[in-house]
Amino acid sequence: STNVLTALRTAPHIDGSQTERRAIKHLVRCMREGIRPVNILIKIPLLLPGEYAVTEIEPARSLYAKLQDIESQQGILDASILIGCAWTDSPYTSVSVIVVAEENSQKAREYAGSLARDIWMRRREFGPDVETVPVEEAIEKAMKAEERPVFISDSGDNVTAGGAGDIPIILEKLLDAGASDAVIAGLADPDAVRLCIQAGVGSDITLNIGGELDRVNGYPLAVTGTVEHLDPPSLAVL
């Protein structure tokens, strides 16, 4: 069981330290004053990819701003919005609202219900704040762009949200398009790293990259390249 629930309030997440301090403050207060907090959770039947709920743009900006208004009410300890992970195949994933009361569960339920209704009423306003296109089209636009650099993000294979981080599809499409001035931020493949270490810096090598951790969404890609840099035992640059 949990005494007090509190969550991050920024997306992308930049308020980790503030959230930790807030949780500790609540816990210490409850211990010192003998408060027995009540956590009220309301789940909303809504799946939102994280990039649809960036807190610097609407509607997330004004919805998250309501949290402080709720917390300012007498008898309320904390309030949180949890976007959830849309890609998690689980009955527990969805947007949720949590309000923590000092003791009065009815008051917490009222505030949680009001915030949940606000989110539901604005559900069609959620969306990405950047252009979304198929991989091939994204690469074509990036190669023609006059302003550089251009970032292409695979929001599905997200290692901070449960993705394997080893899907080489974008790399494959870049090679097919002849994008010689592109950089892939990283692919998880311990076996490929070991092969590069065995070959040594400056060596030409042909090997398979990616597609080992998750064969559902990706597959190994055969590539040939030069080992440019090594940081054993965990990093190789081709």
Q: Model segments located where?
A:
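Acidic, Ser/Thr-rich peripheral helices and adjacent loops at domain boundaries
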Residues: 188-238
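A generic structural motif
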Residues: 126-133, 181-191, 208-212
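C-terminal active-site/capping subdomain that shapes the small-molecule cofactor and substrate pocket
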Residues: 129-154, 159-161
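Active-site histidine-anchored catalytic micro-motif
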Residues: 1-36, 149, 154-171, 175, ...
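Short acidic (Asp/Glu) and glycine-rich catalytic loops that position anionic groups and cofactors
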Residues: 3-7, 42-46, 91-96, 148-154
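General structural feature for long, well-ordered alpha-helical segments within catalytic domains
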Residues: 15, 19-27, 59, 63, ...
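Accessory alpha-helical/coil subdomains and C-terminal extensions
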Residues: 35-42, 48-137, 144
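Short glycine/threonine-rich loop-to-helix capping motif typified by GTGT followed
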Residues: 52-59, 141-143, 159-168, 196-201
